[in-house]
Amino acid sequence: MTPALYRVRQPFFWRNTISLFVIGSIPLAAYWYTFTKMTEDEFSDIPIPPISDEELTKLKKEYEAGKQ
């Protein structure tokens, strides 16, 4: 880059850098909030529906057939 181009861009450098951090912090804050809430969540209170042995063997066969 030429020295003239550096001089033209100089007034905007710090404003653009600050804008980058402000705009970039919004999705990072959303990801951080989501991650902390998901790690705190306790799934032990959700009941697991019972499954019969016949249905379990059927599902295992379907799974094994899908792997091959």
UniProtKB/Swiss-Prot annotation:
One of its GO terms (cellular component) is mitochondrial inner membrane. One of its GO terms (biological process) is mitochondrial cytochrome c oxidase assembly. Residues 35-68 are mitochondrial intermembrane. It is found in: Mitochondrion inner membrane. Residues 1-11 are mitochondrial matrix. Keywords: Membrane, Mitochondrion, Mitochondrion inner membrane, Transmembrane, Transmembrane helix. It is a single-pass membrane protein. PANTHER family: CYTOCHROME C OXIDASE ASSEMBLY FACTOR 3 HOMOLOG, MITOCHONDRIAL, CYTOCHROME C OXIDASE ASSEMBLY FACTOR 3, MITOCHONDRIAL. This is Cytochrome c oxidase assembly factor 3, mitochondrial. The lineage of its organism: Eukaryota, Fungi, Dikarya, Ascomycota, Saccharomycotina.
